[in-house]
Amino acid sequence: MKHLLITLMVLVLSRTATGQDITFDFVKVPRESGFKMDDYFIWCGSIIKVDTVYHLFASRWKKSGSFPEGYRQNSEIVRATSKSPVGPFRFEEIVIGERDSSFWDSNMAHNPTIHKIGDEYVLFYIGSDFTTYLNNSKNLLRRIGFATAKSIAGPWKRSDEPIIKTESNNPAVLIDGRKIKLVFRDESLRVFLAEADDYKGPYKITNDNLWPECELEDFYIFKKNNQTHIICEDNVGGVCGHERWGVHIFSVDGVSNWKKYDPVVVYNHDIIFEDNTVLHCNRRERPQLLIINGEITHIITAVYDGKDTWCQPVELKHTIKIN
């Protein structure tokens, strides 16, 4: 018995020392939850709590367009609110819509992720103008920029220029001491890591092929136990064996030698409701985390059931304390 206890203690200490103590288990979801709009495709979804209200920033475009490609020309970013982190959320306003064609984001805005940096709210997103195309293709060039506000309700001041000049998507931001770390991917789903002293830039690329083994997208980055973690979509199943499931990778130095976390799967395509019915999502993407007082409390994903799309927050059974 003594030897068994010692062995168990060694295993627990070893697991904690290497940081392998993060598990994403979820509670059942209320039927009346999330953020939906009857006439729009809703995608992405990033939540921040301000006082007693939860503010969700999401992308939308009219259902008269196509899914998913319709966002490339018609997406805009909106804000919705709820007293509950799982919703249902109510539409409040358009935050980032069309503007003068001289700007980098005049045509489209997508992939919002909201953060509080100092005394400002900073909304990172991708955008495109009306005339700049990617490599002579039919697709407009997408680039990362930001908007700032002193109040979560605005007014929002948009950056005059993008912070990443090349094709860039799926921005994920980590405030790491005095540094800002930015994860993004290009059109081929090659993953980049960049760093800056200020969220406005300039950004220096510190890793230009973070996960060369396969294609990843839709990132969220955080730190725990002095290790850097990324939650993302396994686009072709090269990490976990399942196409488009959510997976977890990490790095000790936060720059290189990224590895699979154990457990590697964060979520699959099934959402279980409180009435025990199961939604088998056609697509479940764009994972974002809700962090309150240094603890991960919910995951937010965009879901598609074959007809409608919406943002679906799901509560964790056990919160995850991060640093």
Give the residues covered by each predicted segment.
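Sec-dependent N-terminal signal peptides
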Residues: 3-13
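Carbohydrate-active catalytic/glycan-binding domains of CAZyme proteins
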Residues: 19-323
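Acyl-donor-binding surface of acyltransferase catalytic domains
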Residues: 16
